Swiss-Prot record:
Present with 1340 molecules/cell in log phase SD medium. One of its GO terms (cellular component) is mitochondrial membrane. Its main location: mitochondrion. GO terms for molecular function: ferrous iron transmembrane transporter activity; iron ion transmembrane transporter activity. This is Mitochondrial RNA-splicing protein MRS4. Disulfide bonds: none annotated. GO terms for biological process: iron import into the mitochondrion; mRNA processing. Solcar repeats lie at residues 21-108, 118-200, 207-300. It is found in: Mitochondrion inner membrane.
Length: 304
């Protein structure tokens, strides 16, 4: 095998993380990416949750600057980190499943010879399957996280027990169908846009953290904007049982349809776009961090 053939083989091996790569490499890379993404961007995510949930109460402020100022003054600078334990506990395993499933499906759907060509539909399908598997694991942790983001006086175990005792086990999965409705297109577009941008900016498929970061940011901004209405519905379903929710129609919303009607009745069509700015602000670096961390871990693990 000559030098050029060897170089191409190495690029295919790196980019695809093929089936013969150790399973633990795929899982560790995914777990590392998930923990980095969710922990570093957690305060912005918490702000997004509060902006969306502000519509579940009477006379609540919804501006980003006013919310940050109010939270810092009344609750302290660490208030927006409340609940990070829950998301770290869930993000590691969930993202391990997410990226591991993605690589597995991608390796089965796309032959090694076709890895250098643009395969948006197969990439999107791989991301969709990965999302269904990962969200089944992550949804309970996400529900607990959002309750903690609204009520900073509680702890992870106390909230978990409170949800189970007062609302039953099903409460951890009320938002699962909506989460899938949001995350399936998010993941499909995420993988498709990221891979497409990578093919454009990095046609050699080489390890390049700056390019990975750029492509991840482009993907994150686009996907966040497209899925904000579904994220608003998901927030209603996940925090409806919280004591901080005061509007009765919001408290009774336990299905996708009821949550949608509640938002529409209380806020009109604009209600589906609450939290758009912090969601985009959060997802640009979050998705960039996730992809860069994943590619970094994948590169390191494949070389070692």
């Amino acid at each position: 095998m000559n030098t050029s053939e060897l170089s191409i083989a190495e690029e295919i091996d790196y980019e695809a993380l093929p089936s013969h790569a150790p399973l633990h490499s795929q899982l560790l890379a995914g777990a590392f990416a998930g923990i980095m993404e969710h922990s570093l961007m957690f305060p912005i995510d918490a702000l997004k949750t509060r902006v969306q949930a502000a519509g579940l109460n009477k006379a609540a402020s919804t501006g980003m600057i006013s919310q940050i100022s109010k939270i810092s003054t009344m609750e302290g600078s660490m208030a927006l980190w409340k609940g990070v334990q829950s998301v770290i506990l869930g993000a590691g395993p969930a993202h391990a499943v997410y990226f591991g499933t993605y690589e597995f499906c991608k390796a089965r759907l796309i032959s090694p010879e076709d890895m250098q060509t643009h395969q948006p539909m197969k990439t999107a399908l791989s991301g969709t399957i990965a999302t269904i598997a990962a969200d089944a694991l992550m949804n309970p942790f996400d529900t607990v996280k959002q309750r903690l983001q609204l009520d900073t006086n509680l702890r992870v175990w106390n909230v978990t027990k409170q949800i189970y005792q007062n609302e039953g086990f099903a409460a951890f999965y009320y938002s699962y169908p909506t989460t899938l409705a949001m995350n399936i297109p998010f993941a499909a577009f995420n993988f498709m846009i990221y891979e497409s941008a990578s093919k454009f900016f990095n046609p050699q498929n080489s390890y390049n953290p700056l390019i990975h970061c750029l492509c991840g940011g482009i993907s994150g901004a686009t996907c966040a904007a497209l899925t904000t209405p579904l994220d608003c519905i998901k927030t209603v379903l996940q925090v409806r049982g919280s004591e901080t929710v005061s509007i009765e129609i919001m408290k009774d919303a336990n299905t996708f349809g009821r949550a949608s009607r509640a938002i529409l009745e209380v806020h009109g069509w604009k209600g589906f776009w609450r939290g758009l700015k912090p969601r985009i602000v959060a997802n640009i670096p979050a998705t960039a961090i996730s992809w860069t961390a994943y590619e970094c871990a994948k590169h390191f693990l494949m070389k070692n």
